[in-house]
A protein has these predicted regions:
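Conserved two-metal-ion catalytic palm core of "right-hand" nucleic acid polymerases
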Residues: 1-169, 180-186, 191-194
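Extended charged low-complexity segments that act as oligomerization/scaffolding linkers
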Residues: 117, 265-270
């Protein structure tokens, strides 16, 4: 078994356009490899996958809300490309074994370059809309949530499901070796973050879904959320015991106690309304979302260029209006961070600077939205360079805040902005904190040096290249493209490169 050219071509375009996940800054080196995609494809196509040993990933503790966290993983870009190609090439085998799409709503595979791996971006809303309809004919609704699902998935279960889905043996072995590389050899847990992992996680629930269907349950599911529609409270309690037994016997999974609940129809329909993402907090948010939909046609990935939006529509996204909306979310006793993150993603589509001030001023309350805030800031258009400089000053102040100092993910997210926008230039400050910074921060500071043309500073770090970790090496090789032609050629030729991604990146550096 080998990866096909079509799969590899698609994977390169996919990761370049959609990044490797929703939580981390895009790996900038992907663009360089994309320019030399034929070299990467030729190095992988037709080759034994065992030749490509999984590389070190990055793991960070990421906030879910004010008091809970999850561990998120970013795969090495080579592994992201290979895994994406594998799922593109063989993922339909998993999809064909799943229950119908109006029973299991999450992560239905239909790879396209415009939408990514999964077909329906409105699946979450449709799940709750279907739940609302089913509740009208039920006496009780049982709401179940599998506890810590991704971290509890056994690799042996993944292996069995990939076999049943027709994955070639070599592909299965590579996937399992990748999973083990992210868990320090422990045979349990899959990484949270990478797009293709969602389908692998879904594959492990196929036996659970089949068992619930065989038991005659009227249920629907989205990822680890299961809803069962019952005729009585007695039936709901009996079904609860059955599901708990199925999860335990099949995969030693458990239900999350605080989210397990039996609802009456009226109470449940209120919950359904609360769970739908597109539910504006006030009329002003509804008006802004209407403007965005008018220009994007409802496509959550389409951006609106400043030149295409009318002056009157642009003016609606004022600092006063946007700040009021965000403050209204934050004033709630139980802040709806899921909905607030969704709002920031919509703001990123239009790129209006109206949310900058409130976002930076209220970061202590907006921690669970930080990745979305940074993505929003990187999308901002039509402001003067001097304003970017002021934004950079505020970001540097945030780096000194206690809540940022104590969280690697916060620091990574903030520093990544300096490496992607030349106008935020505060490199003189960043260079002073380089030696005392963590490895991941050094990577972003090196990329910031490249962005701000601090070539002489980069040159001073050539001697430490051999001691850099994999992620720093990638960044420094990329940055070496700014050296004079003879210098970068001599530097690149001094070292060996591990794997097709590094090799192609080094060839790109010498070619420009």
């Amino acid at each position: 078994m080998t990866l096909s050219r079509d799969s590899l071509e698609w994977a390169i375009e996919f990761v370049s356009d959609h990044s490797d996940g929703d939580l981390f800054p895009k790996i900038i080196e992907i663009n360089a490899v994309k320019e030399k995609s034929d070299l990467f494809i030729n190095a992988v196509e037709g080759k034994d996958l065992s030749l490509f040993t999984p590389k070190p990933c990055r793991r960070f503790i990421v906030p879910k809300d004010e008091i809970s966290y999850r561990q998120a993983t970013q795969l090495h870009p080579q592994d992201s490309l290979l895994l994406s190609a594998l799922i593109y090439q063989f993922g339909q085998g998993i999809e064909d074994r799943r229950l119908e799409k109006d029973r299991v709503f999450s992560y239905r595979v239909l790879p396209t370059l415009s939408d990514g791996l999964y077909s329906n971006k409105k699946a979450w809303n449709e799940f709750w809309q279907k739940a609302n309809r089913l509740a009208s004919t039920a006496s009780c609704i049982l709401y179940l949530d599998i506890a810590d699902f991704y971290n509890q998935i056994y690799h042996h279960t993944v292996e069995n499901q990939l076999i049943a889905s027709g994955f070639p043996n070599q592909a299965i072995k590579w996937v399992i070796s990748l999973l083990e590389s992210t868990t320090a050899g422990v045979s349990r847990g899959v990484p949270i973050g990478p797009h293709p992992i969602h389908l692998i996680a879904e594959s492990t629930l196929i036996p659970i879904d089949n068992s619930l269907e065989s038991s005659g349950f009227n249920f629907i599911r989205f990822a680890d959320d299961i809803l069962i529609f019952c005729n009585s409270e007695k039936e709901a309690k009996s079904n609860l015991a059955t599901v708990a037994s199925v999860l335990d016997k099949q995969q030693r999974l458990m239900l999350q106690r605080h989210k397990t609940k039996i609802y009456k129809p009226g109470e449940f329909r209120t919950l359904c309304a609360e769970m739908v993402e597109d539910r504006p907090i006030d009329r002003e948010e509804a008006r802004l979302l209407g403007i965005i939909r008018r220009y994007t046609g409802g496509n959550p990935y389409q951006t609106i260029s400043y030149n295409s939006i009318s002056d009157s529509d642009w003016s609606q996204f004022s600092t006063e209006v946007v700040s009021k909306i965000i403050n209204e979310y934050l004033s709630q006793d139980d802040v709806d961070y899921i909905r607030l993150r969704w709002f920031y993603r919509r703001l990123a589509q239009v790129g209006h600077p109206g949310a900058i001030d409130v976002s930076l001023e209220k970061l202590d309350s907006l921690g669970p939205c930080l990745a979305n805030i940074c993505f929003y800031i990187s999308s901002i258009q039509n402001i003067e360079p001097e304003q970017w400089k002021n934004i950079g000053s505020k970001l540097l102040q945030l780096l000194e805040a206690d809540e940022v100092k104590e969280n690697e993910f916060f620091r990574l997210s903030i520093l990544s902005l300096f490496s992607r926008n030349e106008y935020i230039n505060h490199f003189a400050h960043l260079s002073k904190i380089f030696n005392s910074s963590d490895s991941f921060a050094r990577r972003e500071i090196m990329l910031s040096a490249f962005q701000n043309r601090a070539i002489d500073w980069l040159r001073e770090h050539k001697e430490s290249f051999s001691n850099m970790d994999n992620w720093q090496r990638l960044a420094f090789v990329f940055c070496a493209s700014a050296f004079p032609k003879d210098e970068k050629k001599y530097f690149i030729n001094r070292f060996d490169y591990d794997g097709p991604f590094e090799e192609v990146l080094s060839k790109w550096v010498k070619s420009i």
